[in-house]
Amino acid sequence: IPHGKTQAEYSALDTQGVLKPFVTRYPELQAHTLQPEIYKEGLYHDCDDDITQMAKMILSHEPVATGITPLQLTDENFGSIPRYYIECTEDRAVTPFIQQKMYTETPCNKVYKINTSHSPFFSRPQELCDIFFEIAAL
């Protein structure tokens, strides 16, 4: 996401993502959560059911500020670090359209594609680690 933009701006453009109707807002906490009934379809559709059950125990509130605060990026910091993106081609939470928009507007050294849901660390951990090892060797 480029300098001065917010995650919420990109989320608003994502008409195919399945999570929005399942967000519960807690204004008093300045936070929101996902309703558990969307976990499987929205985050873990290619994972074993025990992963979804574990998620129900560990996923928690997310601060609203992280999505509405414009990013402040500088060439000295963000611009000096090589960037790589791992596109999850079957992601239903942050759809490929939005992922492509993000990495196109904030160019990367390389884009990797992995045929997974939003959670490749659970569904394809070895393939994800192989990508990390390749990046680390660059």
Each model region followed by its residue ranges:
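Conserved serine/cysteine hydrolase catalytic core
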Residues: 50-51, 57-121, 125, 137
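Flexible "cap/lid" loop of the alpha/beta hydrolase fold
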Residues: 1-36, 66-67, 72
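Plant-biased detector of terminal regions, especially N-terminal secretory signal peptides
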Residues: 36-37, 133-138
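Helix-loop "lid/cap" segments that line or gate small-molecule binding pockets
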Residues: 37-46
